[in-house]
């Protein structure tokens, strides 16, 4: 697993967001996902770059996955990447408790960082947003990428709020997307 400083040095490169394939019956196609990650890693090895790979971002359809499906996708990604590039797992959920649970799991299986959107159904106040990320930071040793996406979260984290957030979380925040 990378240190936060090493991750910070890689997040200003290309961020590859993996897609999650599904079977026609709606079940996650884990074998297809594994193939996709292997293909991506092979191309990165052929053409080395400063980059990260993110499972379970928006392109990975994270809101449509169960917690167990999200965890399995993250585990497979970390396993297949095998340290070739940093894995920044998408771990955002509709609640702080579930976000922390998925994020702790991602850390436990070897993800280098997490990418986290605000809870997206009941949008928190500014104080709630600060508390959400502070609670998450307190639970993790790995770096956090703040996914500032008002189209999906219903809220925009303004620069002054981001400054306060960085003060609250120490060096845990490695980037903002």
Regions found by a protein language model. Give the residues of each.
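Active-site beta->alpha loop and helix N-cap motifs at the rims of alpha/beta catalytic domains
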Residues: 2-156, 173
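Active-site/ligand-binding-proximal alpha/beta "capping" segment
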Residues: 161-177
């Amino acid at each position: 697993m990378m240190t936060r400083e090493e991750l910070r040095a890689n997040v200003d490169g290309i961020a590859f967001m993996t897609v999650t394939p599904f079977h026609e019956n709606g079940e996650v196609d884990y074998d297809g996902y594994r193939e996709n990650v292997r293909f991506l890693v092979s191309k990165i090895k052929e053409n080395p770059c400063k980059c990260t790979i993110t499972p379970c971002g928006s392109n990975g359809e994270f809101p449509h996955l169960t917690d167990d499906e999200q965890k399995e996708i993250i585990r497979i990604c970390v396993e297949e990447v095998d340290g070739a590039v940093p894995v920044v797992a998408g771990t955002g959920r509709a609640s702080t408790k579930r976000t922390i649970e998925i994020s702790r799991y991602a850390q436990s299986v070897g993800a280098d960082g997490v990418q986290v959107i605000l809870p997206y159904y009941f949008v928190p106040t500014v104080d709630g947003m600060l508390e959400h990320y502070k609670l998450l930071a307190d639970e993790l040793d790995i770096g956090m990428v703040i996914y500032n996406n008002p189209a999906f979260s219903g809220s925009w984290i303004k620069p002054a709020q981001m400054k306060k957030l960085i003060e609250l979380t120490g060096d845990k925040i490695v980037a903002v997307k």
